[in-house]
Every structure is written in C-alpha cells, then in structure tokens.
Curated annotation (Swiss-Prot):
Pfam families: Transferase (PF02458). It comes from the Eukaryota. It is an enzyme of class 2 (transferase). Belongs to the plant acyltransferase family. GO terms for molecular function: acyltransferase activity; oxidoreductase activity. The active site is at H155 (proton acceptor), D381 (proton acceptor). This is Limonoid 1-O-acetyltransferse. Its EC number is 2.1.1.-. The gene is L1AT. It catalyses: (1S)-1-hydroxy-luvungin A + acetyl-CoA = (1S)-1-acetoxy-luvungin A + CoA. InterPro entries: CAT-like_dom_sf. The lineage of its organism: Eukaryota, Viridiplantae, Streptophyta, Embryophyta, Tracheophyta.
C-alpha cells in the first residue's frame, strides 16, 4: 500500500486564547501519563469522488479544527515544563495524504500495524521535529472514494474521554450545528483544570525513568486485533452471572478482559521457566463520576487512575468468572474516599511507587487494559456519514486496548505481546472459543 503526503500545515485556533487562560496547569495524573501520542482512526467509505470534493472536505476539516482548538486551547499549545502547558496558540499539525492505487477495504479487512501506521501523522516510535499536543492526518483513497481520518492526542493532556469529546466538538463545528445551546457544557468545561484536585508533584529521576520505560516501544512486540462477537459476549456474561454466588454480573469489558487475562496466564503456564507466580492486571478507571462533587465529563486531562488486580497464576483450570469479579472489585474500590486517601498530603508519589515496585517484581507479569468502549466515536459524522470502522494502533508491550465494534455490541481488542508469546496466546482455548482474528468488518 502506497500513501503519499501531499501537504502539511499548522492549524491555529480561530480566536486567540485570552491572557488569563495562557497557562494550563497539569495534574499529577497528567504527569504520570507520559508524553506519547495515541491515535484514533476513523474510516469513512465513499466520501469523495473528485479533487474538488477532496479540497472542500479538507477545507471543512481544517476550518472546523481551528474552531475546536479555540475551546480546547491547550491542544494548540506546547508543553512548557513538567507542571504546565503554554497555551501560546502555536497550533496543531494537519496533514493531507493520497492513496491513489489502494482500496480502503484492504486495511479494514485484514489490518496490520504497518498499514495503520501509514495513516498516522507520525510513526509510533517517531518523535515529531516540533513537539505538538495534537496532530491529524486525512488520507483519501482515490480508487474507492473512501477516507481515513487519524487524530493523535498527547497523553500529557488527554485520556480517551477527552479525545472522544474533542472529536465530538470538532464534528459539531464541521456539521454546522449550534454550539451555543446543547453544547454549553462543552464550552464551559472543556478546560476545567484538575490540578487543584490532583496537585502536580516533583518527580525523582527514578520515577520519571520508570514511567518512560512503561511507555517504551519495542521491535519485538507483535500487535493483533481480536474480535469478540456481541452474541458470544452476551452468552459469556450470562454464564459468569449464573456461576456467581455473590450476585455479580460482569460488564462487557470485564467479561472480555477476563478471557484476555486467562490467555496471558495460559502463555505463562506454557513457559519453560514458569517463573511468574502472579499476573498483575491494571485497568484505567475514569474518575470523573467517582469523586464528590463529580468532575464535568467534558473536562480535559488524564482523569483516570489504575485499578490493580493481583491474580495468582496456578496450574489448575482458569476460572474466568473469578478473574472478571476480581477485576471488578479493583475497579469498584476506586471511589471518592479511596482517591482522597491516595492523594492526601501529597501521598500520591509514595503510593504510586508502591505500585511501580510491582512492575519490577520478578515474580509478577504486568498487563495493562485500556477500555475505550461506550464512547461516541461511531457517531462522528462530519457531514458525510458515520464511520464504518474505528480503530487505533500501538506497540506497547503487554497492553490491550478495547473498542466497541460498529454494532455497539461486540468488542475489538488490540493486543500487543512479545512475538514469542503471541502464537501461544492465539491458541488459548478461551481466545479460540470467544474471539476471531482477521474478520472482515465492512
């Protein structure tokens, strides 16, 4: 597949950022998120038929992006230091590309990291020559009329909720909807600062190195997509619920996460040395509605904290229901009382260091789950219809990103593992029973 970039420009906010908003203070949760860019890729079939319509589409995207940056001004700024963003209206990157001889279905039917990476403004392990907090790339597939829009967000100031709300606002401006009525909350709370709730802290070089290592990429990582059908998930949820003596009924994310974690355990049990006694599962939890008073849902930043479940790796048959319920308990304990204690008197760092020690415990394997489900990404209609497929791409070791399938019932899991483990993971009985690989979506 050959994709050629035809233009690149910097999009500035349509209105200058007021002086009193020139500095956006980071929270400690922003500080620990790392400075990598994470992508969301939206695929639209049959959007453009000629150069005139391509130009109109690009102009619309750029104009509405400029308007959106006025509300989300930190995304047009630059990281000033470890405590703040300079909202200097430098702008965001916008790249236009053409795939003259390729059909978009080639990617959607059997996506690979290499294919998806070509749709990004920058490669996954590439540092932009000029640091940006947001970069977008639109790729037109001239052979079929399809289009892919990739938006990359800096993890310093965005979690998946922030990213989804940014795209929703961008769509609102592009479609010409009235942003002064139903979207008042977006305008009012888009840059609600959380530094007063989760104050920033000075990090030691050790903590900073640990965070960087946890976000590093590796050529020895293999990333694949596993599709969990909605009907199979529903049956799995019902089975788990019937087996629970406590009345527990799993969510879609908890049920699918249990199958994935069971697959990782299976890999560990097949290892020649079998030296990991536990699997430490980490799942990002949205804090917006878990504190009192709640933080506005539209607020930007990394308003998430990890739920941690330490799961014993045993020779006996894997109990998926128990895995799901243990993960559920680790999520549910993150409430207002827990968060106030965790962050009280600047205690976040000491508590975080206790967690980080688990990363380097030779008896534990760490696996991270990021659930992007129940976000309105499939509602992103800029004026040419809703996306046929929404995806991401990553290479972080021992990570799974979960997204809704297009029907809203299933889940697509992007799983990144060391190459030596992926073949074993694919053959795990739970994965074979509940997931499929390389299934055509459109």
């Amino acid at each position: 597949m050959e994709i050629n970039n035809v233009s690149s420009e910097i999009i500035k906010p349509s209105s200058p950022t007021p002086q009193h908003l020139k500095t956006h203070k980071l929270s400690v949760l922003d500080q620990v998120a790392g400075d990598s860019l994470f992508p969301i890729i939206l695929f639209y079939p049959q959007t453009c038929s000629n150069n005139t319509s391509l130009n109109k589409t690009s102009d619309l995207l750029k104009r509405s992006l400029s308007q959106t940056l006025t509300l989300y001004h930190p995304f047009a700024g630059r990281l000033k230091d470890e405590f703040s963003i300079d909202c200097d209206d430098t702008g965001a990157t916008f790249i236009e590309a053409r795939a003259a001889a390729s059909d978009m279905s080639e990617i959607v039917k059997q996506p690979t990291v290499d294919m998806l990476e070509q749709l990004m403004p920058y490669k996954l392990n590439e540092k932009p020559s000029v640091a940006v907090n947001l970069a977008a790339k639109v790729t037109y597939f001239e052979h079929c009329g399809g289009m892919a829009l990739c938006v990359c967000f800096s993890h310093v100031i965005a979690d998946i909720t922030t990213a989804a709300n940014f795209i929703k606002t961008w769509v609102t401006f592009a479609s010409g909807s009235d942003t002064s009525s139903e979207d008042d909350d977006v305008i009012k709370h888009a840059v609600f600062g959380c530094s007063s709730i989760f104050p920033p802290q000075k990090f030691s070089s050790f903590s900073r190195n640990v965070i960087s290592e946890n976000h590093s990429n590796s050529a020895e990582i293999l990333t694949k997509r596993f599709i969990f059908d909605g009907d199979k998930i529903a049956a799995l949820k019902e089975k788990m619920g019937s087996e629970s003596s406590s009345g527990y009924h799993p969510t879609r994310v908890e049920a699918v996460s249990a199958i994935i974690l069971g697959g990782i355990m299976s890999v560990e049990k097949q290892a020649d040395d079998f030296n990991h006694s536990h699997l430490v599962a980490s799942i990002a939890v949205n804090l917006r509605n878990r504190v009192n008073p709640p933080i506005p849902e539209q607020s930007i930043g990394n308003i998430v904290q990890a739920g941690i479940a330490k799961l014993p790796i045993e020779k006996k048959t894997i109990d998926y229901r128990n895995l799901a319920e243990t993960l559920h308990k680790s999520i549910e304990k993150i409430n207002d009382e827990y968060l106030r204690k965790f962050h009280a008197d600047g205690g976040f760092l000491s508590n975080m260091n206790d967690v980080l020690e688990g990363l380097f415990d030779k008896n534990c394997r760490w696996f991270t789950i990021s659930a992007w489900c129940r976000r309105p990404l499939y509602e992103a209609d800029f004026g040419w219809g809703k996306p046929a497929w929404v995806s991401t791409v990553m290479k972080h070791k021992d990570v799974a990103v979960l997204l809704d399938s297009s029907d809203g019932k299933g889940i697509e899991a992007w799983v990144a593992l060391p190459k030596k483990d992926m073949a074993k993971f694919e053959q795990d009985s739970g994965i074979l029973r509940y997931a499929s690989i390389d299934t055509s979506l459109i």
